[in-house]
Amino acid sequence: MTRPELRDDVRIVDTTLRDGSHAQSHQFTESQVRDTVRALDGAGVEVIEVTHGDGLGGSTFNYGFSRISDLELVQVAADTAEQAKIAVLLVPGIGTADDLRKAADRGAEVVRIATHCTEADVSLQHFEIARDLGMQTCGFLMMAHRTTPEELARQARLMVDAGCQVPYVTDSAGALLMHEAKDRFDALITEVGDDAWVGYHGHQNMSLGVANSVIAYEAGVRYIDGSLCALGAGAGNSPTELLAAIFDRMNIATGLDVMATLDAAETVVRPYLNRWPKIDRNAIVQGWVGVYSSFLLHAETAGARYGVPVHEILRRCGELGYVGGQEDMIIDVAIQLAKVSGTVSEPSASLVAG
C-alpha cells in the first residue's frame, strides 16, 4: 500500500456536502450540490465529500431522511467535478459494502470509513473492499477525545494494516484542547507516519477547530478537513475559506485560490444555508462535555417536544457517555429530564408529523 501523492504541502478536504448535511437536515438539492462542487473544484479543492451526514445508508428514521439519495448526489458531484475527486463517508453498521460498491460505480474515488475511536476492528473488511475497488482510503477515528493518544494510535495501526492510507484524528465533539490534539497527532504520526498520512477533522464547538488545524500541520498532519461557511454539525467545521487564507499567510501551499474559496462561501453556500453554524450555549456544552456534534438538531427537536432546555439534554448525553449512533437515546434523556422538572408535555401535531 502507498500513500496518496500530495500535490501541495497540505491537502484541504472539503466536507460542506457531507458534514454540512447535518446542519441542512439532509435536504441538499441537486442544484446545490452541482453549484457547490463546481465552485470548490474551480477553487482548487482536490477532495470533496458528498453524502448524508451519517454517510452512505444514513437516510433513515433514526438519523433523518435525505431529500435526494446519496447515490444520486454522488453522481451529480462526479459529473460536475473536473479535477476534484468525490469522497463518500461510510460508517460500518449504517452503510454496507454494497453501498460502497454502488457509490464507486457512480463516480466516488475516495472513501472515509468511520468508527468510534476504540472500534477500528469493525472497519477492516471495508478497507479491504475499498482497496479492491481502487479507491483512496481514509479512516475516521471518531470522538477522538474519548481515548488516550496511545490507544488512538493503536487503533490507527489496525486501520492502516487493513488498507487505510489516511487515518484521521476525528474530533467529532469539538472537545480537544490544543495540547490534547497535539498529543494525538504526535502519537499517530509516530505509529503510522512511515506508512500513511495522518488527517485531522475538527469542529468549532470550543472555537478550536481552526487553531488545532494549524497545530496539526505543524505536527506533520497533511490531510485537514474544512467546510465552506463552517457548515457542519454542532458549531460547524473549520471554515475551508479561513483555512485557505491562514495557510496562505503562513506560506503553506494548499493549491487553493483564496479569493475563489471566499467567493464559493459567500455567493454559493451562504444563500442556501438553513442555519448559520454558531458557537452558542448549546454548541459550547457539546464541546465542554464531549457530545457528538450531530446530536444538536436531534436535541433541539426533543427539547421542543418535551419542554426541556436543549443544553441540559446535551449535557446529560455527555454525562452518560453516548456516542455517534445513539441518537435514539436523546428522546429518552429528554423524557427523563421532563419528568424530573415536571414539564412533561404532549408533542404537538406538527412535531409528531415532522
From Swiss-Prot:
Q: Where does Mn(2+) bind?
A: 19, 201, 203
Pfam (any one): HMGL-like
What Gene3D superfamilies does the record point to?
A: 1.10.8.60, Aldolase class I (3.20.20.70)
Question: What InterPro entries does the record tag this protein with?
Answer: 2-IPM_HCS-like, 4OH_2_O-val_aldolase, Aldolase_TIM, DmpG_comm, DRE_TIM_HOA, PYR_CT
PROSITE patterns listed in its UniProt record: PYR_CT (PS50991)
Entry's Gene Ontology molecular function annotations: 2-isopropylmalate synthase activity; 4-hydroxy-2-oxovalerate aldolase activity; manganese ion binding
Q: Which GO terms describe its biological process?
A: catabolic process; L-leucine biosynthetic process
EC number(s) per entry: 4.1.3.39
Residue intervals of the Pyruvate carboxyltransferase domain: 10-262
Q: Which family does it belong to?
A: Belongs to the 4-hydroxy-2-oxovalerate aldolase family.
Enumerate the HAMAP family for this protein.
HOA
What is the recorded name of this protein?
4-hydroxy-2-oxovalerate aldolase 6
Which organism is this entry from?
A: Rhodococcus jostii (strain RHA1)
Lineage of source species: Bacteria, Bacillati, Actinomycetota, Actinomycetes, Mycobacteriales
